Amino acid sequence: MPVEGATTSSYNEKTFWYYPWGKSVTHKDVDIFAKEGTNVCSSTTGLAVFCGYKEMGGNVVLVIGPKWRLHYYAHLKDIKISCFKWVSRGEIIGTVGKTGNATNTSPHLHYSIMTLIPYLWRIDKDKQGWKKAFYLNPISYLETK
């Protein structure tokens, strides 16, 4: 679990691929709610390829891990690592916040996993269903770790 102390009751599994969802149309991630400032840990070993600010994600860390999977951590209050740093699974990379388009919500980590190699068989007729080739269900990943 990328948020210290979080459990399955800290998120709603029905929010992955939820439609409609504002500017992003479909929610392709899971929001893990916690007290602002709670540590966020890398859920994988890998290379931090982006650490900075994005308009919608706010303070963001992007880690590329095994199988060319990108782990996206957004709405962070603080970023605790530098870009192009190797991180270990469980290493603190930031803290839970509400930056970017989450300023009017409860503090949470917006977490997603994307693959660089498309899984074409996952495409369907849902809104933005073609993106299912790239976005993996992070809840399935969390439950196996």
Feature map (PLM): residue ranges:
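Small beta-barrel nucleic-acid-binding modules, principally OB-folds
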Residues: 22-32, 63-67, 113-125
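Active-site loop architecture of trypsin-fold serine endopeptidases
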Residues: 96-110
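Surface-exposed, glycine-biased beta-strand/turn segments
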Residues: 1-59, 89, 98, 135-145
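Acidic, glycine-rich catalytic/binding loops that coordinate metals and/or anionic ligands
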Residues: 82-91, 112-145
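Solvent-exposed coil/turn segments that connect beta secondary-structure elements
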Residues: 37, 45, 66-68, 99, ...
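Zn2+-dependent peptidoglycan hydrolase active-site motif and core
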Residues: 42-80, 106-110
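Generic beta-structure capping elements
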Residues: 10-11, 66, 76, 114-116, ...
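A generic structural motif
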Residues: 35-37, 68, 76, 91
